[in-house]
Amino acid sequence: MSITKEFDTITAISTPLGEGAIGIVRLSGTDALAIAQSVFKGKNLEQVASHTINYGHIINPKTGTIIDEVMVSVMLAPKTFTRENVVEINTHGGIAVTNEILQLLIRQGARMAEPGEFTKRAFLNGRVDLTQAEAVMDIIRAKTDKAMTIAVKQLDGSLSQLINDTRQEILNTLAQVEVNIDYPEYDDVEEMTTALLREKTQEFQSLLESLLRTAKRGKILREGLSTAIIGRPNVGKSSLLNNLLREDKAIVTDIAGTTRDVIEEYVNIKGVPLKLVDTAGIRETDDLVEQIGVERSKKALQEADLVLLVLNASEKLTDQDRALLNLSQDSNRIILLNKTDLEQKIELEQLPDDYIPISVLTNQNINLIEDRINQLFFDNAGLVEQDATYLSNARHISLIEKAVQSLEAVNDGLALGMPVDLLQVDLTRTWEILGEITGDAAPDELITQLFSQFCLGK
């Protein structure tokens, strides 16, 4: 997609393909009303009031054949998502009918929209900035209510406001430095001394570092915790997965080696999305298929944010158990002693003190797993403070880290006694980096790449 503004009219199906109660085909652009009217039998859409819903039929203009009975929403620029004329045709849900209407609109002069092009136009037309555009996709992808809360707040402009206010303060500081350099005799502007610049720079740095401290929590809530369930065969890993999911997704049998691959599922644990990875039991095996599963399990363990190590409390520790304890000791790990409903034989004195005795069969202490996760990753604090602004996007986090580094360079220069005017470069770089977050200074290639990740029709 070109970054220059385009004024042709685009169209796409905005609802998931498949059967459903309603399907929506969207148009945006100067000719949206005229194109929609050319296939609509009902009120004249070019004459109806903005933000109205109009009953009628979509027809094939060449044959007069009725395609579907519809409700058509008409929204006139600039009070629309794209700030262009927007028409949304609400059809009966179904692949055939929505595709037929889409093809009619294209034949009448609309262009098939590219992924994310409606939101891209909202960005190019000043309706949203880049952080708000990204928040749209975060809302769509949110797996828990906490993740959605963060995304909605970002869409509302909380992060944008904070970044823009900081950029303005940096710009004011740069302007003050420039005035001091170009007009040293101008007494109405406070002199930007080394001490004053250090104070301002530290203030900027403190604010950005405070924002960075929200990144761990925000990123977890946005992307989820990659959680590997490990243990030797037949200790209850798949049963634990099913218990957490509240449904049977993994194959549970008494035969060692029945989980031959890595099974991934998402589950909501008190607002935290866990990407649960049920791994094949890690053991030595001659079975080629199972060997592949074991290797994938080891890889999943290395990449996991959280490890749930399941041991069988009704049996003594084996060499495989001890190997897994060693293998996972440097991970964020929760040790689970399963099958406590049976006679206990495991040697507790050989285990770390922080294990949790559970019974997947009777549901004993499963809730303690959730509490331990909160303790490990959130220091027992609440997951989301209602009025707080969170960093959750990896791109934003990386740019804030770079901005902090630029401010550190300013402070280092001040400590070395460098003149204030020579430190403008790093301060200007900080201002530019923060502009990349909101899109004010983002490269065209980045903007194109970001919007290409959106779904069609959004």
Swiss-Prot record:
<dbReference type="InterPro" id="IPR027266">
    <property type="entry name" value="TrmE/GcvT_dom1"/>
</dbReference>
<dbReference type="GO" id="GO:0002098">
    <property type="term" value="P:tRNA wobble uridine modification"/>
</dbReference>
<keyword id="KW-0342">GTP-binding</keyword>
<dbReference type="InterPro" id="IPR018948">
    <property type="entry name" value="GTP-bd_TrmE_N"/>
</dbReference>
<dbReference type="Pfam" id="PF10396">
    <property type="entry name" value="TrmE_N"/>
</dbReference>
<dbReference type="GO" id="GO:0005829">
    <property type="term" value="C:cytosol"/>
</dbReference>
<dbReference type="InterPro" id="IPR005225">
    <property type="entry name" value="Small_GTP-bd"/>
</dbReference>
<keyword id="KW-0963">Cytoplasm</keyword>
<keyword id="KW-0460">Magnesium</keyword>
<feature type="binding site">
    <location>
        <position position="259"/>
    </location>
    <ligand>
        <name>Mg(2+)</name>
    </ligand>
</feature>
<keyword id="KW-0819">tRNA processing</keyword>
<keyword id="KW-0630">Potassium</keyword>
<feature type="domain" description="TrmE-type G">
    <location>
        <begin position="224"/>
        <end position="378"/>
    </location>
</feature>
<feature type="binding site">
    <location>
        <begin position="234"/>
        <end position="239"/>
    </location>
    <ligand>
        <name>GTP</name>
    </ligand>
</feature>
<comment type="similarity">
    <text>Belongs to the TRAFAC class TrmE-Era-EngA-EngB-Septin-like GTPase superfamily. TrmE GTPase family.</text>
</comment>
<comment type="subunit">
    <text>Homodimer. Heterotetramer of two MnmE and two MnmG subunits.</text>
</comment>
<dbReference type="GO" id="GO:0005525">
    <property type="term" value="F:GTP binding"/>
</dbReference>
<feature type="binding site">
    <location>
        <position position="253"/>
    </location>
    <ligand>
        <name>K(+)</name>
    </ligand>
</feature>
<feature type="binding site">
    <location>
        <position position="458"/>
    </location>
    <ligand>
        <name>(6S)-5-formyl-5,6,7,8-tetrahydrofolate</name>
    </ligand>
</feature>
<feature type="binding site">
    <location>
        <position position="88"/>
    </location>
    <ligand>
        <name>(6S)-5-formyl-5,6,7,8-tetrahydrofolate</name>
    </ligand>
</feature>
<dbReference type="GO" id="GO:0030488">
    <property type="term" value="P:tRNA methylation"/>
</dbReference>
<dbReference type="InterPro" id="IPR006073">
    <property type="entry name" value="GTP-bd"/>
</dbReference>
<dbReference type="GO" id="GO:0003924">
    <property type="term" value="F:GTPase activity"/>
</dbReference>
<keyword id="KW-0479">Metal-binding</keyword>
<feature type="binding site">
    <location>
        <position position="26"/>
    </location>
    <ligand>
        <name>(6S)-5-formyl-5,6,7,8-tetrahydrofolate</name>
    </ligand>
</feature>
<comment type="function">
    <text>Exhibits a very high intrinsic GTPase hydrolysis rate. Involved in the addition of a carboxymethylaminomethyl (cmnm) group at the wobble position (U34) of certain tRNAs, forming tRNA-cmnm(5)s(2)U34.</text>
</comment>
<dbReference type="GO" id="GO:0046872">
    <property type="term" value="F:metal ion binding"/>
</dbReference>
<dbReference type="InterPro" id="IPR004520">
    <property type="entry name" value="GTPase_MnmE"/>
</dbReference>
<dbReference type="InterPro" id="IPR025867">
    <property type="entry name" value="MnmE_helical"/>
</dbReference>
<dbReference type="InterPro" id="IPR027417">
    <property type="entry name" value="P-loop_NTPase"/>
</dbReference>
<feature type="binding site">
    <location>
        <position position="234"/>
    </location>
    <ligand>
        <name>K(+)</name>
    </ligand>
</feature>
<feature type="binding site">
    <location>
        <position position="238"/>
    </location>
    <ligand>
        <name>Mg(2+)</name>
    </ligand>
</feature>
<feature type="binding site">
    <location>
        <position position="258"/>
    </location>
    <ligand>
        <name>K(+)</name>
    </ligand>
</feature>
<feature type="binding site">
    <location>
        <position position="127"/>
    </location>
    <ligand>
        <name>(6S)-5-formyl-5,6,7,8-tetrahydrofolate</name>
    </ligand>
</feature>
<feature type="binding site">
    <location>
        <begin position="253"/>
        <end position="259"/>
    </location>
    <ligand>
        <name>GTP</name>
    </ligand>
</feature>
<feature type="binding site">
    <location>
        <begin position="278"/>
        <end position="281"/>
    </location>
    <ligand>
        <name>GTP</name>
    </ligand>
</feature>
<dbReference type="Pfam" id="PF01926">
    <property type="entry name" value="MMR_HSR1"/>
</dbReference>
<keyword id="KW-0378">Hydrolase</keyword>
<dbReference type="InterPro" id="IPR031168">
    <property type="entry name" value="G_TrmE"/>
</dbReference>
<feature type="binding site">
    <location>
        <position position="255"/>
    </location>
    <ligand>
        <name>K(+)</name>
    </ligand>
</feature>
<dbReference type="Pfam" id="PF12631">
    <property type="entry name" value="MnmE_helical"/>
</dbReference>
<dbReference type="InterPro" id="IPR027368">
    <property type="entry name" value="MnmE_dom2"/>
</dbReference>
